[in-house]
Amino acid sequence: RAVLPAHHFDDDTKDVIKLGMGLVATMTALILGLLIASAKGSYDTQKSEVAELSAKVIFLDRVLARYGPETKEIRDLLRGSVEREIDRVWPKDHARAPELVPGGSAGIAFIKIQELSPKDDAQRSLKAQAFSILTDIQQTRWLMFVQRGSSFPMLFLVVVVSWLTMIFISFGLFAPRNATVIATLLVCALSVTAAILMILELNTPFEGLIQISPAQLRDTLMVVGQ
């Protein structure tokens, strides 16, 4: 501010800058809201897929249990598969990145189900149902993998940060230098930073501060194989 000539701070110049920054602030608010909505939508989709996966695993176990005791090996395989998937997607070692690529247990389960020899129509129906559920489980698991990426182009976030930088520069251009103004600008900056952090966290649902809980899949271990 001290570097600019005095005529840059007359009333007309201030009015034009305020109008321009008002337009930029409006666009920034709109884009920021869209980014939050997009990230939240992606997060909720992944969360619902985890819940759906948990329900289908339990349903598959119940179908296999109704088939008969000859499915005990498949049910144990299913339980072990769930335990491994939990460890791969939510590793106890936080230094490890989540592995969202589905493991190979489903292929083994398909083979084991194929080897079943139904003795009546009821078992044939249950075998076909087990195949269908296992296919749905694999489809959901691959959906989790392909949807793991960013729900929006990162260029959007770069543009928003650039606009916010311009807005805060305009605030500092005409604001008096006192503790109240500085504190206010800091609070505003922290609020905007929190919004951007929320976007980034929601965009990585299996790691970070705001991550999807594995509790639903862990709950399946209380049922599967029992």
Walk through the language-model features, giving the residues of each.
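N-terminal juxtamembrane/topogenic regions of multi-pass membrane proteins
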Residues: 1-36
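Alpha-helical transmembrane anchor segments
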Residues: 1-4, 14-16, 146-226
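Juxtamembrane loop-helix boundary motifs flanking transmembrane segments in multi-pass membrane proteins
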Residues: 4-16, 52, 122, 129, ...
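Transmembrane signal-anchor/signal-peptide helices with a preference for the extracytoplasmic
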Residues: 30-51, 203
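Helix-loop junctions at the membrane interface of multi-pass solute transporters
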Residues: 39, 63, 171-174
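Structured inter-helical modules in multipass membrane proteins
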Residues: 46, 59-149
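Short extracytoplasmic/periplasmic juxtamembrane "stem" segments immediately C-terminal to an N-terminal membrane anchor
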Residues: 49-66, 213-226
